[in-house]
A protein has these predicted regions:
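Active-site-adjacent helix/loop segment of glycosyltransferases
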Residues: 7, 219-303, 307-320
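A conserved acidic beta->alpha catalytic loop
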Residues: 15, 23, 41-52, 73
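Acidic donor-binding/catalytic loop of UDP-sugar-dependent glycosyltransferases
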Residues: 47, 102-115
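Acidic/His-rich active-site region of diverse nucleotide-sugar glycosyltransferases
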Residues: 70, 79, 110-195, 199, ...
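Glycine-rich, basic loop-to-helix element that forms the pyrophosphate-binding segment
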Residues: 70-88
Length: 353
């Protein structure tokens, strides 16, 4: 039995192999005595898996147990992490999930576990993640608004722009690029006893985990420790627009908020808008395909979850009715969210832990 398992996911990382090797190298050198690293490769075809395996075999400390899992297909974040979940030590108490473009701080796993030990209802946590090698923040935990926008708390801000960042806070969900979960709680609370639903593939997975945990009576939190540096979207950049819109459409359909009464019109407007714009530009045809795939994904997820997700059972960002009209129906949403920083104080019930 090990106390913690770290699942590290790779897919076609040859184009940024230096960062991927730094990432797995940091995962092998954590200041923690009792853990294993499960390396999952999502059927990479660019030779990156072979480079990574050679690096690990040469650099692995003798005290760290390593398992390699090679998928027969690209299963995305959700399916790949689930493969690692199935391969981990079945008795492990905590499981960390780590992207191949994130370099972890040596003390982070131990410090995250120390916080989790203090509350038996704490199911998932993440720390302070910086954007690449800059001083800008990628995530201090993650939020969902009541008009179905998700993102990183303090995202793209600097520490002095984020009051409360030095204290732990409950958040809507933990950051999936590097988060820690209580394995037993996930087995009890999540459909199929696994941390993710395979069909989500990419995006939505960490948000769905947090929302389900809150709806089941558990908690997710941001812990104020420097946990890592994320060179974001190096793997997903070619498909992020498609999967991002797909995930957002599914989230709208699945998640009940105080704006749920307007969902039918909201979705109809999107559907019609993409159809009309598709007549003029191909990119909107692709967007419409993504929208329809998100609609179908929501049907699958709803049947697997088995109950309605209520945002009000989690901390969330409350949007005013005027803001909802301006930012969504007058198409100002993208401009607003690129220019604003969501802080912990903006979440409902922003109490420290």
């Amino acid at each position: 039995m090990v106390r913690a398992s770290l699942i590290w996911l790779n897919y076609n990382s040859l184009g940024f192999i230096d960062i991927a090797l730094r990432s797995i190298g940091s995962a092998l050198r954590l200041d923690f005595d009792d853990y294993e690293v499960v390396i999952v490769d999502n059927a990479s075809g660019d030779g990156s898996f072979e480079r990574i395996r050679k690096f690990v075999e040469e650099k692995r400390p003798s005290s760290v147990r390593v398992k390699f899992v090679r998928s027969d297909a690209n299963r995305g974040y959700a399916g790949g992490m689930n493969l690692g979940w199935e391969a981990k030590d079945p008795e492990t108490k905590y499981v960390a999930f780590l992207n191949n473009d994130l370099i972890v701080e040596p003390n982070s796993l131990r410090e995250l576990i120390d916080y989790m030990e203090s509350d038996d209802k704490l199911a998932a946590v993440s720390g302070l993640v910086y954007l690449g090698n800059s001083k800008r923040i990628y995530s201090a935990g993650d939020y969902v608004t009541d008009h179905w926008i998700a993102g990183g708390v303090c995202g793209n801000g600097l520490e002095h722009e984020c009051p409360g960042i030095s204290k732990p806070h409950y958040v809507t969900y933990a950051e999936g690029a590097y988060m820690l979960v209580n394995a037993e709680i996930v087995r009890r609370a999540y459909p199929g006893g696994k941390p993710f639903i395979d069909e989500t593939f990419l995006y939505l997975d960490d948000a769905l985990l947090g929302l389900i945990l809150w709806n089941k009576g558990y908690k997710t939190a941001y812990i104020p420790i420097k946990s890592g540096y994320h060179y974001a979207n190096l793997t997903t950049k070619p498909v992020m627009n498609y999967y991002g819109l797909r995930a957002n459409t599914a989230l709208i359909m699945l998640l009940d908020t105080r704006f749920s009464w307007i969902k039918p019109f909201y979705l109809f407007r999107r559907d019609l808008g993409y159809k009309v714009l598709c007549l003029f530009r191909d990119e909107y045809c692709r967007a419409h395909r993504s929208f329809l795939d998100g609609y179908n994904l929501a049907q699958i997820l709803r049947s697997k979850i088995g109950f309605k997700l209520d945002l009000h059972k989690a901390p969330y960002v409350k949007i005013g009715y005027l803001d909802f009209i301006l930012f969504d129906f007058m198409m100002l949403n993208r401009i607003h969210y690129k220019s604003s920083i969501i802080t912990h104080e903006m979440l409902t019930n922003p109490q420290s832990i």
